[in-house]
C-alpha cells in the first residue's frame, strides 16, 4: 500500500473507532439489552455528554491550543481528563445509581481517571482503551459484538502507531487498562 493510501486508511480507522463512536455504540447496545425503556433518557444524556466534550475539544483546537482533536501531546491531556470526568460523573448522576448502566459508566470513569493519573508517565491510548473496554463490556451482552470489537484492536493499534499518535507501550497499556475496566462491568 502506498504511503498516502496507508495514511488515509489509518485516519479513517482512527475516526471510525474514535472513543465517542465506540462509547456511544456500547451505551446504545447496553441500553437496548438491559433497559430499553430508558433509551430516550440515555440518548439525551449521551448526546449532551458527547456534545459538551466535543465543543470543548473544538474550542481547544480552533484556538490553536491543541494541535489535533486527539489531544496528542501529553500536556494537552490533563484538562481533557478533567472535563471528561466531570461529564462522566454528570452522566452517571443523570442515569441514576439504580440504572443497569451505572456500573459501566462508573467503570469507564474509573478507567479514565486512572489514565489521567498515569498521564504523567505514559500517554495511554484512549482509542485503544475505549475499544478494549467496549469489547470486554459487550461480551456478556453480545458475544459476537464483543469479539468483533476485540478483533478490531490490532487494526486500531496499527492506525494509532501509523499516525504517530502513540508508541507501542501506550497502545498496549491503553488496551490492557480498557480490557480490565471493561471486565469490571461483569
PLM segments and residue spans:
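The first (N-terminal) embedded transmembrane alpha-helix
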Residues: 13-33
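Alpha-helical transmembrane segments of integral membrane proteins
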Residues: 10, 14, 40-48, 80-84, ...
